[in-house]
Amino acid sequence: MLKEFKEFAMKGNVVDMAVGIIVGGAFGTIVNTLVSQVLMPPLGLLIGGVDFTNLYLILKEGSKAAAPYAALADATAAGAVTVNYGLFLNSVISFLIMAFAVFLLVKAINMLRREEKAPPLAPTTKECPYCLSIVPLKATRCSSCTSELGK
């Protein structure tokens, strides 16, 4: 049982997949940081100083403090029920950047990959030199004109 597991785990595809998952997780963290810390603050500034992480709708005020709340953290601390659409926008933008990066990566790999052409198949037929009909390669006599064919 252990030997079978070792063979399975050491197959190239399993190891490649594990490396891909680890690198993908790290890349996801980088993209999320890029979106939340680099892209969204200037975008929020351009559209009027809005912090996207603090965009939310209050469904029910909190029991500890009444609305309005200065930030999402204040609403959450007060026990308010909220729809956090700003965080959702950050996630959508992160996904779009991640999808575009994967697209560029796949496109680059496909450009580098050379199409391997299959070797030409060995001929299985030949042409009769007398009547020009097609006969099997191993034939010694033409089936159409009955001429003797050389080996």
Curated annotation (Swiss-Prot):
Alphabetical GO CC annotations of the entry are: plasma membrane
Name the InterPro entries on file: Mechanosensitive_channel_CS, MS_channel, MSC/AndL, MscL_channel
Q: Which segments cross the bilayer? A: 14-34, 38-58, 86-106
Q: Per its UniProt entry, which superkingdom is the organism in?
A: Bacteria
Record keyword Plastid present: no
Q: Which GO terms describe its molecular function?
A: mechanosensitive monoatomic ion channel activity
Q: Does the keyword Cell division apply?
A: no
Which is a Pfam family this sequence falls into?
MscL
Subunit structure of this entry?
A: Homopentamer.
What is the role of this chain? Channel that opens in response to stretch forces in the membrane lipid bilayer. May participate in the regulation of osmotic pressure changes within the cell.
Family statement drawn from the similarity comment of this UniProt entry:
Belongs to the MscL family.
Entry protein name: Large-conductance mechanosensitive channel
- The record lists the organism as Pelodictyon phaeoclathratiforme (strain DSM 5477 / BU-1)
Q: What is the lineage of its organism?
A: Bacteria, Pseudomonadati, Chlorobiota, Chlorobiia, Chlorobiales
